[in-house]
Amino acid sequence: MSQERPTFYRQELNKTIWEVPERYQNLSPVGSGAYGSVCAAFDTKTGLRVAVKKLSRPFQSIIHAKRTYRELRLLKHMKHENVIGLLDVFTPARSLEEFNDVYLVTHLMGADLNNIVKCQKLTDDHVQFLIYQILRGLKYIHSADIIHRDLKPSNLAVNEDCELKILDFGLARHTDDEMTGYVATRWYRAPEIMLNWMHYNQTVDIWSVGCIMAELLTGRTLFPGTDHINQLQQIMRLTGTPPAYLINRMPSHEARNYIQSLTQMPKMNFANVFIGANPLAVDLLEKMLVLDSDKRITAAQALAHAYFAQYHDPDDEPVADPYDQSFESRDLLIDEWKSLTYDEVISFVPPPLDQEEMES
């Protein structure tokens, strides 16, 4: 929203009024969720197909207002090939007093990893390239002290050239309801986050990458649990039951009691589970799908694993600038979050145009 204010036009889409700058044409709805609706559009200024997201009721409560600020701050910070970044942010409002709507513009990504897995079992080389890119993006996100928390195939966008971007990071705060039953929101979640075992760290995302990688190699969901308990049973069938030292570290009395009540199971031999897979892939999976999060491989370590030998380049796996998230602990009023958000909209500077993208 920098420079002079553009000319806006209004149209109704899915019973919602959209008011956007004239540069964005041919808006067509592509989906909506709890936090907003998304239209595909053509950006006449760059020649790119873009996704425009209109946040729904961004300032209706303190929770909403803080979430809006969080999403904008995160997207503005992310500048990496394998992470979705912000192309534009705008509001039709001419002043803070009028400010009520926020629109975010990102690249329009064709397919997600779900579409790709459904269509075919991937070659080992495809799996290497896709997982390498996820880890390259995660190394960047984690270096800014951000945890994705909700990595799953539908949050990984892939284009025709197999180039991948991570979507929707750092925002996920799922309700219990959304995590209940036979749902993909939970199948990729690390056990410690799913069951509130203990304070979790960035390696919750590595667990998810392990689940995704196993699915790419086999064509099937690794742990398609019907509920929390069934999911834990499926996980432990593979990893074995947690050792005593790990159980003792769990602050939750209920979690400790429940796990101590389970029949002891040994860890399975991963080579017998992933028959026919590249032995290096199996070795990496064993380092990702570890119950003890302190012993799980990190994104930076995983990039240096022999499985990615043909892609790994330590000089081209960048880290992020420091990200100040001290706002997370602040208790502010709606109007204060709104004012901070308005400042972020106004101060936005669009990224330099990528020649390759404009030609594609």
From Swiss-Prot:
Instruction: Determine if Ubl conjugation is one of this entry's keywords.
Output: yes
- On this chain, the residues bearing N6-acetyllysine are K53, K152
Q: Which residues bind ATP?
A: V30, G31, S32, G33, A34, Y35, G36, S37, V38, K53
Q: Which residues carry this modification: Phosphotyrosine?
A: Y182, Y323
Coiled-coil parts of chain: none
Which PROSITE patterns does this one have?
MAPK (PS01351), PROTEIN_KINASE_ATP (PS00107), PROTEIN_KINASE_DOM (PS50011)
Q: What is its EC number?
A: 2.7.11.24
List cellular component terms (GO). cytoplasm; nucleus
Gene3D superfamilies from the xrefs? Phosphorylase Kinase, domain 1, Transferase(Phosphotransferase) domain 1
The protein's required cofactor(s) are namely:
Mg(2+)
Family to which the UniProt record says this protein belongs: Belongs to the protein kinase superfamily. CMGC Ser/Thr protein kinase family. MAP kinase subfamily.
Q: What does this protein do, in the record's words?
A: Serine/threonine kinase which acts as an essential component of the MAP kinase signal transduction pathway. MAPK14 is one of the four p38 MAPKs which play an important role in the cascades of cellular responses evoked by extracellular stimuli such as pro-inflammatory cytokines or physical stress leading to direct activation of transcription factors. Accordingly, p38 MAPKs phosphorylate a broad range of proteins and it has been estimated that they may have approximately 200 to 300 substrates each.
Q: Could you tell me what this protein is called? A: Mitogen-activated protein kinase 14
Q: What is the lineage of its organism?
A: Eukaryota, Metazoa, Chordata, Craniata, Vertebrata
Question: Gene encoding this chain?
Answer: MAPK14
